[in-house]
């Protein structure tokens, strides 16, 4: 028997949904931002639609100038969209000033007050809101414990490391209990090891507080490490939206394949072998096999394969896998892995990441002729 769900009317200015849980923390509807200088108009963000869920760690990822920071600034209220609607928890906040939006921002510059202690820095926003002193002490203590700085409450910022200062800035933003926290490349000033440690720390904190984090970065490893979902941006548009695994394993465009991780791009004219399999022949006994949907054209395919999916060896692989012969042009030993660059007969360079096992017989040297092979499901077909 069919059932129906009773819907409660939404409050004025709030989008009606099946339940409060279904209301996105942040939504952008056909949002664009253009800048005009004289007769020149520059489009920073072009008609993007985006929903960020309650309680998720969401990253806006892309190269410099892709529009990710402008998008975040429109969410925060520091920039007003040229067109479109910005909603927070279903409420239209387009045109609402930043101080009236229930979001806080953390920047790469920590902006801590040097003359104040750690506790005073964290308490600053609460004091401006005239929160009772007893509540301030409780909330500040809770936040400092959360960021593991409870024993540093009386320290001045200059007495802290860069990572500790970043955690103070994070506590200062979270103590206000915003519905969402916006982070604009906050780890950019830290060294590599500290940055990697802080990535895990940020994810832990986000899980514990349970609020929405929106993270802007150009660093793919940061986005892949921390995010529940990622929007990859390019030239003011969202090229792909998905989980880290979806973005990495099944890139939607050639740009995403090249920007996220390392990809080998192969092109050619394909012939359909079966309903779900195509083959590109490279002469002789060399070919690439790829799984494809039935409706995809057989001509002019672009195929990507990740370096770690490829096996390198001296023996001819089986015919039921992709197999290409080439000459080793470069060998880079990196401890756990060795990276090979192999030049094929059509002068295409293919990069291979091979795990270094105790069996050294699989290793190849510069100038060696080798076979590369991978399974059909590891060849991902992109739009031509």
Swiss-Prot record:
Belongs to the ABC transporter superfamily. Spermidine/putrescine importer (TC 3.A.1.11.1) family. ATP binds at residues 62-69. NCBIfam families: potA. It comes from the Bacteria. Part of the ABC transporter complex PotABCD involved in spermidine/putrescine import. Responsible for energy coupling to the transport system. The keyword Transport applies. Residues 26-260 form the ABC transporter domain. PANTHER family: SPERMIDINE/PUTRESCINE IMPORT ATP-BINDING PROTEIN POTA, SPERMIDINE_PUTRESCINE IMPORT ATP-BINDING PROTEIN POTA. This is Spermidine/putrescine import ATP-binding protein PotA. InterPro entries: AAA+_ATPase, ABC_SmlMolc_Importer, ABC_transporter-like_ATP-bd, ABC_transporter-like_CS, Mo/tungstate-bd_C_term_dom, P-loop_NTPase, PotA-like, PotA_ATP-bd. Pfam families: ABC_tran, TOBE_2. It is an enzyme of class 7 (translocase). It catalyses: ATP + H2O + polyamine-[polyamine-binding protein]Side 1 = ADP + phosphate + polyamineSide 2 + [polyamine-binding protein]Side 1. The complex is composed of two ATP-binding proteins (PotA), two transmembrane proteins (PotB and PotC) and a solute-binding protein (PotD). GO terms for cellular component: ATP-binding cassette (ABC) transporter complex. Its EC number is 7.6.2.11. The keyword Cell membrane applies. Keywords: ATP-binding, Cell membrane, Membrane, Nucleotide-binding, Translocase, Transport. It comes from Thermobifida fusca (strain YX). It is found in: Cell membrane. SUPFAM superfamilies: MOP-like, P-loop containing nucleoside triphosphate hydrolases. GO terms for molecular function: ABC-type putrescine transporter activity; ATP binding; ATP hydrolysis activity. Signal peptide: none annotated.
């Amino acid at each position: 028997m069919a059932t129906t769900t009773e819907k409660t009317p939404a409050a004025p200015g709030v989008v009606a949904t099946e339940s409060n849980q279904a209301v996105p923390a942040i939504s952008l509807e056909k949002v664009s931002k253009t800048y005009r200088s004289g007769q020149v108009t520059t489009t920073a963000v072009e008609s993007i639609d985006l929903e960020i869920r309650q309680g998720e760690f969401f990253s806006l990822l892309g190269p410099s100038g892709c529009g990710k920071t402008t998008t975040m600034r429109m969410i925060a209220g520091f920039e007003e969209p040229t067109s479109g609607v910005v909603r927070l928890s279903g409420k239209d906040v387009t045109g609402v000033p930043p101080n009236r939006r229930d979001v806080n921002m953390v920047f790469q510059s920590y902006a801590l007050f040097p003359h104040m202690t750690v506790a005073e820095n964290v308490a600053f926003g609460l004091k401006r809101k005239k929160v009772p002193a007893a509540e301030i002490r409780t909330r500040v203590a809770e936040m400092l414990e959360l960021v593991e700085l409870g024993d540093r409450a009386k320290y001045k910022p200059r007495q802290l490391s860069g990572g500790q200062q970043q955690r103070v800035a994070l506590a200062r933003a979270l103590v206000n209990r915003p519905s969402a926290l916006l982070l604009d490349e906050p780890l950019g000033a830290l060294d590599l090891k500290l940055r990697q440690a802080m990535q895990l720390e940020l994810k832990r904190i986000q899980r514990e507080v349970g609020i929405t984090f929106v993270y802007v970065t150009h660093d793919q490893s940061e986005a892949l490490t921390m995010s529940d979902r990622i929007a990859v941006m390019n030239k003011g548009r969202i090229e792909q939206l998905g989980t880290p695994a979806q973005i990495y394993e099944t890139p939607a465009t050639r740009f995403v394949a090249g920007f996220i991780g390392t990809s080998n791009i192969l092109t050619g004219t394909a012939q359909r072998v079966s309903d779900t399999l195509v083959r590109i022949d490279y002469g002789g006994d060399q070919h690439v096999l790829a799984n494809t949907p039935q409706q995809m054209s057989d001509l002019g395919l672009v195929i990507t394969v990740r370096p770690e999916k490829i096996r390198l060896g001296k023996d001819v692989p089986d015919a039921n896998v992709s197999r290409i012969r080439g000459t080793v042009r470069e060998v880079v030993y990196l401890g756990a892995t060795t990276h090979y660059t192999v030049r094929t007969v059509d002068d295409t360079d293919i990069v291979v990441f091979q795990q270094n096992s105790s069996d050294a017989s699989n290793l190849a040297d510069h100038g060696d002729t080798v076979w590369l092979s991978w399974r059909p499901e590891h060849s991902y077909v992109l739009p031509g």
